[in-house]
Amino acid sequence: MSLSLYDSAHSLDGKSGWDTPVFSMKDSMDRNPMVTEAWEALCQSQVYFRGKPVGTIAAYDHASEEVLNYDQVFVRDFVPSALAFLMNGEPEIVKNFLLKTLHIQGQDKMIDKFKLGDGAMPASFKVLHNPIKKTDTIIADFGESAIGRVAPVDSGFWWIILLRAYTKSTGDHSLAERPECQKGMRLILSLCLSEGFDTFPTLLCADGCSMVDRRMGIYGYPIEIQALFFMALRSALSMLKHDSEGKEFMEKIVKRLHALSFHMRSYFWLDFQQLNDIYRYKTEEYSHTAVNKFNVIPDSIPDWIFDFMPLRGGYFVGNVSPARMDFRWFALGNCIAILSSLATPEQSMAIMDLIEARWEELVGEMPLKICYPAMESHEWGIVTGCDPKNTRWSYHNGGSWPVLLWLLTAASIKTGRPQIARRAIELAEARLLKDGWPEYYDGKSGRFIGKQARKSQTWSIAGYLVAKMMMDDPTHVGMISMEEEKHMKPPLRRSSSWT
């Protein structure tokens, strides 16, 4: 990796990426030396553009000869870093990041002679520093350099969510009210609220469009995107101005939220009772009276789910589309469902019940499984295209990702179950620092450092810090959490696990 990225930190105004946050040096020495080291590593990861911090690189692995794209600032990767800085009273880097990515959004976006939508946000960007000319240049990637060449659907949603978190944390509404930020939100919303051929309120997506950025069979209506979509809509609703343009979008958002919450809570939700109902489904039903609305064939239910599903507990399945229900558990989508109140309070508690009941499967020795269970053998070959990185219990195919610790912690605090977070943090503290902050862990229980995992992975570091700070001060959860709106509450039905 070229060190020019770090040279720029010193080149223009003397600021250094090694500045240490007040929290880390003043308080964490007495609390936990691991926190101090984490803060130092997070500060080292800062990227500067013309003397100002604009993000954090994905990883700074001294031992790795191949840099690949780990020296870039990824939008989704920066979110836990941003939350850590906000919780520590350092909003400048977050503000700079939001404005810089907004500027990048306005660029022409061409991939193989095809122009992307105006609202598309980059997957990542890289700062190139010329020490001779003392100039900094930003090069953005909208998916043209990614595996599979897929544009990130989640980037725009994370941007809106982070703008709300900045506003909630600082109390500064002026940034969100800027004309360019209002326009940026509207452009993102235009992409996902446009009318088309869909009969569902969910977003149709390609494989590899989110954190699961390789072929993993999530094409269709993946839970991660739907949950982020819901949260971004609610975030935008609270920040759009009540002018003519803003009101037009607000009306669309309210209608979409109502339809989306009903759809997700009705058709994506799975618990013991609903599983039993699907098991007994009739097929080939026509007309609006159909119970099996998606014509899911009971014989397509995988064997593992019957043992996995506890009597108390439930979760949002990975995907629902015609004649297809992906029963896999995806951690990020379910945690975001809790934080955004896409899940009802009863469903939120049921998700936490499931995590407790299936701790060995979903948490094991390192929190948290990104996806469960892993695909193997013939299924792995067909679904992933024989992807050597996504072999069973590795990477996105059942790997354990420490960054998810902050999401689990936030969900635990919101549902009044902090003991779940405390237990998970203790597991992480036993290994993360000693292992050099790996990107992910492999194995059915998450025991082994991932076979291709980078060390000094920034979001593993930031995820741990955010989890610790939220446990230390649970009010921090408010910047990323939302309470349920009364108009979205559905009539409660089915699910013995909710009571």
From Swiss-Prot:
The keyword DNA repair does not apply. Pfam families: Glyco_hydro_100. The modification Phosphoserine is found at residues 11, 497. One of its GO terms (molecular function) is endo-alpha-N-acetylgalactosaminidase activity. It catalyses: Hydrolysis of terminal non-reducing beta-D-fructofuranoside residues in beta-D-fructofuranosides. SUPFAM superfamilies: Six-hairpin glycosidases. GO terms for biological process: carbohydrate metabolic process. Invertase that cleaves sucrose into glucose and fructose. This is Probable alkaline/neutral invertase F. It comes from Arabidopsis thaliana (Mouse-ear cress). The gene is INVF.
